[in-house]
UniProtKB/Swiss-Prot annotation:
Residues that hold NADP(+) according to the record: 53, 158-161, 181, 200, 229, 246-249, 269-271
Protein name: Quinone oxidoreductase
Organism: Cavia porcellus (Guinea pig)
Self-association and partners: Homotetramer.
EC number: 1.6.5.5
Pfam families, A to Z: ADH_N (PF08240), ADH_zinc_N (PF00107)
Residues found modified as N6-acetyllysine: 23
InterPro entries with a match to the protein in the record: ADH-like_C (IPR013149), ADH-like_N (IPR013154), GroES-like_sf (IPR011032), NAD(P)-bd_dom_sf (IPR036291), PKS_ER (IPR020843), Quin_OxRdtase/zeta-crystal_CS (IPR002364), Zinc-ADH_QOR/CCCR (IPR051603)
Amino acid sequence: MATGQKLMRAIRVFEFGGPEVLKVQSDVAVPIPKDHQVLIKVHACGINPVETYIRSGTYTRIPLLPYTPGTDVAGVVESIGNDVSAFKKGDRVFTTSTISGGYAEYALASDHTVYRLPEKLDFRQGAAIGIPYFTACRALFHSARAKAGESVLVHGASGGVGLAACQIARAYGLKVLGTAGTEEGQKVVLQNGAHEVFNHRDAHYIDEIKKSIGEKGVDVIIEMLANVNLSNDLKLLSCGGRVIIVGCRGSIEINPRDTMAKESTISGVSLFSSTKEEFQQFASTIQAGMELGWVKPVIGSQYPLEKASQAHENIIHSSGTVGKTVLLM
């Protein structure tokens, strides 16, 4: 290590496994930005469920070991590399990706994945924008081709992506239905864009949704737990309806016949299949929402960096998650 190299605290993963493989190190070198790169002093980093799958080694994208998790940071620009003209030291920013990892006191990001954070949003909220809001945009507009006047059911609406989908869909003129598993979650879903909310722990909630949507059915379903809900989703759709799968934790058996009569479709969402141009389109939508005030990230559980393993444990095993889980530096 070069003499005088600045050091930071960061979470490092040296082997795939359970939450216990997240190790705090205090002697990690602060990265130096190269061309088209931005170094950010991290104030908060969002935790996404997919990061637990990556950590366990079971996800389709496996990073080289060792690595630092985290994509959604919010903070202040510390320094910039050559050919960066959009940002300067001191700018408040958030990201949709990082090069060096976000569970750290400093994070390196490519300049095209960095966006300005308005003063009206704090750093915790900034750390809740990246994957949740960009995924919701991709699900609604790229995958579902949703448009004003249609109906959307956000199946599992109280988490980060679900609340983002409710806010965006409401702002764009859709009729929004949501589900949540707790009274608190239902209240938050109604406060963030849903016209109606249903308790998905109620044994008869599917019947309640059917009563609400009538014979026509619902046009779009944004599905957060497909391995539990997909079969029921197909029975709720309108003719030409679309189920968009954002989350899944296992397999499920469905009857393909349920897709035939209504010519319904099932599509998956992978945010990082988006092109740079698509990311910019999503960013324009979200930045407009920030300016107009309908992008309002809801913060759930908050943890210090040292409790990252506990955060990973809770984000998967705690029931009734409300809002976005964040690490604070």
